[in-house]
């Protein structure tokens, strides 16, 4: 197994929101699997007629988890701030940074933008 991605805490009421969670096996980390999975999930959840047609999704990550932060940034997430004592991790309540995606950000699709961005030479991306 390369990893896992999930969309949970879905609210189909007035908020139309969900929470993205993911992990990647250490052997496959850094190869682009997580950003690709998040982009595909976002396109499905926001735009696909078979998806829940959400308005907002969020990712919460530990402040020291630089790899997860890079995933959120590569996909185009918006940094929202730190949530104190947000999640119980390894026996203690830990602060988490929160990042969000919005349906209005989808444009031609998160996956399309991710592929296009990484297909361009790095000097052109800036």
Predicted regions and their residues:
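Acyl-donor (CoA/ACP) binding surface of acyl/acetyltransferases
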Residues: 1-126
């Amino acid at each position: 197994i390369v990893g896992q991605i999930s969309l949970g805490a879905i609210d189909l009421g007035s908020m139309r929101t969900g929470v993205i969670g993911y992990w990647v096996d250490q052997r496959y980390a850094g190869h682009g699997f997580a950003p690709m999975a998040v982009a595909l999930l976002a396109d499905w959840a926001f735009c696909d007629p078979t998806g829940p047609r959400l308005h907002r999704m969020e990712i919460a990550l530990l402040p020291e988890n630089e790899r997860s932060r890079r995933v959120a940034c590569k996909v185009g997430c918006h940094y929202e701030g730190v949530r104190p004592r947000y999640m119980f991790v390894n026996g203690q309540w830990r602060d988490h940074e929160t990042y969000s995606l919005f349906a209005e950000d989808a444009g031609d699709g998160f996956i399309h933008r991710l592929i296009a961005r990484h297909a361009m030479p790095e000097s052109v991306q800036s």
